[in-house]
Curated annotation (Swiss-Prot):
It is found in: Cell inner membrane. ATP binds at G169, D170, R171, Q172, C173, G174, K175, T176. GO terms for molecular function: ADP binding; ATP binding; proton-transporting ATP synthase activity, rotational mechanism. This is ATP synthase subunit alpha 1. The record marks S373 as: Required for activity. One of its GO terms (cellular component) is plasma membrane. InterPro entries: ATP_synth_asu-like_sf (IPR023366), ATP_synth_asu_C (IPR000793), ATP_synth_asu_C_sf (IPR038376), ATP_synth_F1_a_nt-bd_dom (IPR033732), ATP_synth_F1_asu (IPR005294), ATPase_a/bsu_AS (IPR020003), ATPase_F1/V1/A1_a/bsu_N (IPR004100), ATPase_F1/V1/A1_a/bsu_N_sf (IPR036121). Its EC number is 7.1.2.2. The gene is atpA1. It is a peripheral membrane protein. HAMAP family: ATP_synth_alpha_bact.
Length: 513
């Protein structure tokens, strides 16, 4: 059998046409060294800052140092199987995490993988963990409240939707308790909560998750956990991952609340990574960009305008503004708020709630120092009734603290000073609150009203809290209509004031406390 040349060329042509050749062009390099989860790679010429790199064994890393002849990367996860000479490939992608309503009620790691044993997340969307914060034009001023359910915070340092309010204090003085109570109090308030646990013991994180489950708060909460046993890279990334999950709701005209517990541990993790990458250390051995580490994270919490939401959703959501409220936690050493990281975060946030160990040990819990705690923008968001009634409380407390210091040395006090000290003692007692028992607006209003109008002045200090509890029960049974009016209008009319005065007098006469 003989083939002529034209047949051969036709056969070759048909074979070539049927061939699907695809080239996967990817830059690759070689591992030079691996130490403490930090890898040096030679030969990766075309790599982005923050790009994901692919290592053998389905392991990924993050390119952080781009130098002339090598790349410094941090490995996400286990790195024991990576050795010198391994091939590393670029992916052309920035690190992304899953986002969307499917994440609500789940416990995830810093990369968005479920760690609660409830099966896969099945999120339909992913988003980059590093994003630029909304510009000035797209923002709205804070005007709606986030009720924490804590008397001392809602009355003296109110928080608004879209605000960044720092919770700062020494270890073991109730910072996490304030944050968890705030989450529990959001039941039925159409606010998605995200709790980011950074560098905490796994047992502590488990206790928080269990408490959220018991109170039914996990139904509207996402937990992102990077425990103390996880690598520094995971602890560094967890807040950004949580923030991206919160931004999904903010950008679609919903409200979200994110708690970073705590950012001191994130700064430590970032310092560790930076020193291992041989970046020059600065004050307290932190790298030069530790301020930017927190500012770029906290600036992403904002209240965005209706126009921003409409533009982002391509006109699907109209007339709704979204918000992401941040409650970062910072741990101080021996009450030193002038250290590097605390001063940085104080300057970035819109106010701080300062918790003191001395107050905590004295049984004043939540241990809030009213003199140093401020909310720079929350006043505009406070509910009318609380705003009306809380002005006197702050002044009473501030004057009491000042006078109490002098009263230790003075034996004979005039009547006015003595009265002020007595009032201050009762107000201090009134602001105490057990954990996991947040209050509704009407309960807070009634407590403040009774303090402002002198109904506590003739009580023993030890009777203040039983009186408050009894009063709430009495109003629930005998004055349900008054409660409903306060709760619906979030205000106290002249008629309601008279009704409340009458109810308080009746309750005091009954002595049922």
């Amino acid at each position: 059998m003989q083939l002529n040349p034209s047949e051969i060329s036709e056969l070759i042509k048909s074979r070539i046409q049927g061939l699907e050749a695809s080239a996967d062009v990817r830059n690759q390099g070689t591992v030079i060294s691996v130490t403490d989860g930090i890898v040096r790679i030679h030969g990766l010429s075309d790599v982005m800052q923050g790009e994901m790199l692919e290592f053998p064994g389905n392991t990924f890393g993050l390119a952080l140092n781009l130098e002339r002849d090598s790349v410094g990367a941090v490995i996400l996860g286990e790195y024991e199987h990576i050795s010198e000479g391994d091939i590393v490939k670029t992916t052309g992608r920035i690190l992304e995490v899953p986002v969307g309503p499917e994440l609500v009620g789940r416990v995830l790691d810093a990369l968005g993988n479920p760690i609660d044993g409830k099966g896969p997340v099945n999120a339909k969307l992913t988003d980059a963990i590093e994003k630029i914060a909304p510009g000035v034009i797209w923002r709205k001023s804070v005007s709606q409240p986030v009720q924490t359910g804590l008397k001392s915070i809602d009355s003296m340092v109110p928080i608004g939707r879209g605000q960044r309010e720092l919770i700062i204090g020494d270890r073991q003085c109730g910072k996490t308790a304030v944050a968890i109570d705030t989450i529990i109090n959001q039941k039925g308030k159409d606010l998605i909560c995200i709790y980011v646990a950074i560098g905490q013991k796994a047992s502590s994180i488990m206790n928080v998750v269990r408490k959220l489950e018991e109170t039914g708060a996990l139904e509207y909460t996402i937990v992102v956990a990077a425990s103390a046993s996880e690598s520094a890279a995971m602890q560094y990334l967890a807040p950004y991952a949580g923030c991206t999950m919160g931004e999904y709701f903010r950008d679609r005209g919903q409200d979200a609340l994110i708690i970073y517990d705590d950012l001191t541990k994130q700064a430590w993790a970032y310092r560790q990574i930076s020193l291992l990458l041989r970046r020059p250390p600065g004050r307290e051995a932190y790298p030069g960009d530790v301020f930017y580490l927190h500012s770029r994270l906290l600036e992403r919490a904002a209240r965005v305008s209706e126009e921003y939401v409409e533009k982002f959703t391509n006109g699907e959501v109209k007339g709704k503004s979204g918000s992401l409220t941040a409650l970062p936690v910072i741990e101080t050493q021996a009450g030193d708020v002038t250290a590097f990281v605390p001063t940085n975060v104080i300057s970035i946030t819109d106010g701080q709630i300062f918790l003191e160990t001395d107050l905590f040990n004295a049984g004043i819990r939540p241990a809030i120092n009213a003199g140093v705690s401020v909310s720079r923008v929350g006043g505009a968001a406070q509910t009318k009734v609380v705003k009306k009634l809380s002005g006197g409380i702050r002044t009473d407390l501030a004057q009491y603290r000042e006078l109490a210091a002098f009263a230790q040395f003075a034996s004979d006090l005039d009547e006015a000073t003595r009265k002020q000290l007595e009032r201050g003692r009762r107000v201090t007692e009134l602001l105490k609150q057990p954990q996991y028992q947040p209050l509704q607006v009407w309960e807070l209003a009634v407590s403040l009203f009774s303090a402002n109008n002198g109904y506590l002045d003739d009580l023993d200090v030890k009777d203040v809290l039983p009186f408050e509890k009894g009063l709430r029960e009495y109003l629930k049974t005998s004055h349900a209509d008054l409660i409903k009016r306060i709760e619906d209008t979030k205000d106290l009319s002249k008629d309601d004031e008279s009704a409340l005065h009458a109810a308080l007098k009746d309750f005091k006469k009954s002595g049922a406390y």
